[in-house]
């Protein structure tokens, strides 16, 4: 079996895929999130290669049944198709380098490429939103070229500006709000990824796609 299922405290259960992260496995996670339907479930949280469901601790719940249900849905998901009701592709304008991308030069040197080549590699891909987490509107994206996978900073920053575009390991993403963080910051976007006044506060849903485009650069 390619998954493990384990409790998370007394109010949650997680199904985790033991295989490497892939878009195929992530689509199966999304499908489970769409199709698990039990009245006592309070929240469904798709993650990277895993899904967690939380439930009412005061409800008489058969946890063994819920565990078997998650496993059954995982097997069913192999032949099912995920339907994203949004499914949009959004172009995200980015200003690369300079004060807005203080780690661009260091990252390009680490990979022995020019800053221009780094930007080309970063903007060439169409990224898929695997899940939204860490903070409201923060998207974890699949599709970063392995040539620019970059370890997180040894010393995280205490304050990263809103809109900062970063690379952390095999991931790239955008900080929707000012926060501490350890990703390598290569640029910044003015696009608002999360706005509580919108009908749909988060700009992206799992399964959506985005492509970074160059708005400007200081190299």
Predicted segments with their positions:
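Glycine-rich active-site loops that engage anionic ligands at enzyme catalytic sites
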Residues: 1-219
């Amino acid at each position: 079996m390619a998954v493990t299922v384990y409790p998370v405290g007394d109010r949650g259960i997680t199904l985790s895929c033991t295989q490497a992260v892939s878009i195929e496995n992530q689509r199966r996670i999304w499908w489970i999130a769409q199709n698990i339907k039990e009245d006592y479930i309070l929240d469904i949280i798709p993650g990277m290669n895993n899904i967690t469901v939380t439930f009412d601790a005061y409800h008489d719940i058969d946890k063994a049944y819920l565990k078997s249900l998650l496993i059954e849905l995982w097997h069913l998901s192999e032949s099912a198709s995920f339907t994203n009701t949004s499914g949009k592709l959004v172009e995200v304008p980015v200003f690369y380098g300079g004060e807005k991308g203080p780690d661009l030069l260091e990252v390009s040197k680490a990979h022995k490429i020019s800053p221009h080549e780094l930007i080309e590699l970063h903007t060439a891909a169409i990224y898929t939103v695997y899940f939204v987490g860490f903070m409201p509107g923060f998207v974890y994206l699949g599709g970063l070229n392995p040539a620019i996978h970059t370890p997180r900073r040894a010393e995280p920053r205490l304050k990263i500006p809103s809109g900062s575009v970063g690379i952390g390991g095999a991931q790239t993403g955008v900080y929707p709000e000012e926060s501490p963080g350890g990703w390598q910051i290569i640029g910044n976007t003015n696009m608002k990824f999360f706005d509580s006044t919108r009908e749909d506060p988060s700009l992206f849903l799992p399964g959506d796609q985005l492509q970074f485009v160059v708005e400007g650069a200081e190299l």
